[in-house]
Regions:
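C-terminal non-catalytic regions of proteins with extracellular/luminal or membrane-system context
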Residues: 3, 7-183
Length: 183
């Protein structure tokens, strides 16, 4: 696309972000002097933000949350995946198989969370989960994400939950316990 089109899309994306709650005033993040743990496979995903309804977007052409947060160099940012969302690489044609067993990254994620002032967790759906013929039987966080969220909360409750999803999600535990949620 042209620069004008790209600028317009960026403006729409910025305006589509909704602050659902900010009970501890964790947002806005400080521009300097803050230790931030960034956790979640979707935080380093350049494809899912494009969604499955994109027409001509190049794969992996979005700016990931990790890349965006790295722009603020006066904070100490540490990233840990915590757990893979899917077992195999997701594509439009593949059936998505979610990771429900590999918790090997939980300890590293808990360690960085325990040493942070604030934890930003990017959770939700893979971009290829929504779209034609992509119905779900429940609206919970897929894979191990709910378990990861609860484990991180035990070591640091100062969590900003950033949701990446193409449909409503059922998040009763997060709504009750997580102080800041952005969608």
């Amino acid at each position: 696309g042209s620069k004008a089109n790209n600028d317009g899309v960026l403006d729409m994306a910025k305006k589509s972000i909704v602050l659902l709650k900010n009970d501890k005033n964790l947002l806005p993040l400080k521009k300097s002097g803050q230790k931030i743990a960034l956790i979640g496979a979707l935080a380093n995903d350049k494809n899912s933000p494009l969604g499955s309804w994109r027409l001509a977007a190049d794969d992996n052409s979005a700016v990931s949350v990790l890349e965006g947060m790295q722009q603020y160099k006066d904070n100490k940012l540490t990233y840990e995946k915590g757990a893979d969302l899917t077992i195999e690489k997701a594509t439009f044609l593949n059936e998505l198989v979610f990771n429900t067993t590999d918790r090997s990254g939980f300890d590293a994620a808990k360690k960085v969370a325990a040493n942070a002032d604030v934890v930003v967790m990017v959770l939700g759906e893979n971009g290829f989960q929504t779209g034609e013929a992509r119905s779900r039987t429940n609206l919970d966080l897929p894979g191990l994400q709910q378990e990861l969220l609860e484990e991180i909360y035990k070591v640091n409750p100062n969590i900003v939950l950033v949701l990446n999803n193409g449909r409503p999600l059922a998040l009763p535990w997060a709504a009750k316990n997580i102080p800041t949620i952005v969608e």
